């Protein structure tokens, strides 16, 4: 497959905290990347979705705050939840089994409202402490991201 090396998918993920526990979800076996593995809510940018937003420039198509828009949309779609203001945790790049590179921006946010209601992309969920999350078959790096959020929360007091 000849891919333009400059092109990447862009994805966002959100570690959602509620009462000292974090939402983890199990990916459907039909997913292209990491089927059956545990993760946190998130997903890829889809141009047709943010193009529905009003452009912030009269001269050309341009949109501000698209990362937060996509993050909130993915959390709502995958888990049925609303979140507080998301905060940046880290980023990474991985290459999917089909050869496409994905830039992932990881955030955390406190649960604001709603009860977990999974969509077709996820098959199970759990609210787990960082220690409890170690017992799940998490995608590489998710445990470390959860532990980073625990450190951030401790620093915030």
What are the roles of these predicted feature ranges?
Residues 82-85, 90-115:
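Active-site-adjacent beta-strand/loop module that shapes the phosphate/pyrophosphate-binding cleft
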Residues 106-108, 117-149:
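NUDIX/MutT-family hydrolases
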Residues 80-81, 138:
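Helix N-cap/coil-helix junction residues
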Residues 18:
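A cytosolic small-molecule/anion-sensing beta-strand core signal
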Residues 2, 33, 72, 114, ...:
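HhH-family (HhH-GPD) DNA N-glycosylase catalytic core used in base-excision repair
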Residues 21-73:
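Conserved Nudix-box catalytic region and its N-terminal flanking loop in Nudix hydrolases
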Residues 1-13, 27-30:
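Acidic, metal-coordinating catalytic segment for phosphate/diphosphate chemistry
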Residues 11-12, 66-67, 123:
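Short loop/turn microsegments at loop-to-beta-strand junctions
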């Amino acid at each position: 497959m000849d891919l333009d090396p400059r092109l990447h998918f862009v994805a966002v993920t959100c570690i959602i905290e509620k009462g000292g526990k974090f939402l983890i979800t199990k990916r459907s076996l039909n997913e292209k990347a990491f089927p059956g593995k545990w993760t946190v809510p998130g997903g890829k940018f889809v141009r047709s979705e943010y193009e529905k937003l009003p452009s912030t420039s009269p001269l050309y198509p341009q949109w501000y705050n698209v990362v937060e828009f996509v993050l909130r949309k993915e959390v709502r779609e995958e888990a049925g939840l609303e979140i507080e203001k998301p905060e940046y945790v880290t980023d990474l790049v991985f290459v999917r089994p089909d050869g496409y590179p994905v830039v992932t921006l990881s955030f955390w946010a406190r649960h604001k409202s709603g009860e977990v209601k999974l969509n077709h992309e996820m098959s199970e969920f759990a609210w787990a402490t960082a220690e409890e999350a170690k017992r799940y078959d998490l995608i590489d790096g998710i445990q470390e991201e959860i532990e980073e959020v625990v450190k951030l929360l401790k620093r915030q007091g």
